[in-house]
């Protein structure tokens, strides 16, 4: 089983969860929640400008740096 990352916030998506959206040009976007899906597809928001996305990405990078330093 493969674990994908959310195209909007970067969270891991466990198998059997999330939304897979295929654009007309063939690009596959995977979302962990409806919140991410609506923010990107329906409202066209930029994830870099969303405070909650920045918070998730910072926590993810901090966890990765701790695990790589061991």
From Swiss-Prot:
Reported cofactor(s): Zn(2+)
CDD domains membership: Ribosomal_L24e_L24
GO BP annotation list: translation
Cofactor note: Binds 1 zinc ion per subunit.
GO molecular function terms listed in the Swiss-Prot or TrEMBL record: rRNA binding; structural constituent of ribosome; zinc ion binding
This protein's UniProt keywords: Metal-binding, Ribonucleoprotein, Ribosomal protein, RNA-binding, rRNA-binding, Zinc, Zinc-finger
Keyword Membrane in annotation: no
Annotated positions binding Zn(2+): 6, 9, 32, 36
ZnF (C4-type) ranges: 6-36
InterPro entries: L24e/L24_sf, Ribosomal_eL24-rel_arc, Ribosomal_eL24-rel_N, Ribosomal_eL24_CS, TRASH_dom
SUBUNIT field: Part of the 50S ribosomal subunit. Forms a cluster with proteins L3 and L14.
Family: Belongs to the eukaryotic ribosomal protein eL24 family.
Biological role stated in the UniProt entry: Binds to the 23S rRNA.
NCBIfam families listed in its UniProt record: PRK14891.1-1
Name of this chain's protein: Large ribosomal subunit protein eL24
Biological classification of the source: Archaea, Thermoproteota, Thermoprotei, Thermoproteales, Thermoproteaceae
């Amino acid at each position: 089983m493969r674990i994908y990352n959310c195209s909007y916030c970067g969270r891991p998506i466990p198998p059997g969860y999330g939304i897979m959206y295929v654009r007309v040009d063939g690009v596959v976007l995977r979302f962990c929640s409806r919140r991410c899906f609506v923010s990107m597809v329906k409202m066209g928001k930029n994830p870099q400008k969303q405070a909650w996305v920045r918070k998730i990405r910072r926590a993810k990078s901090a966890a990765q740096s701790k695990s790589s330093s061991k």
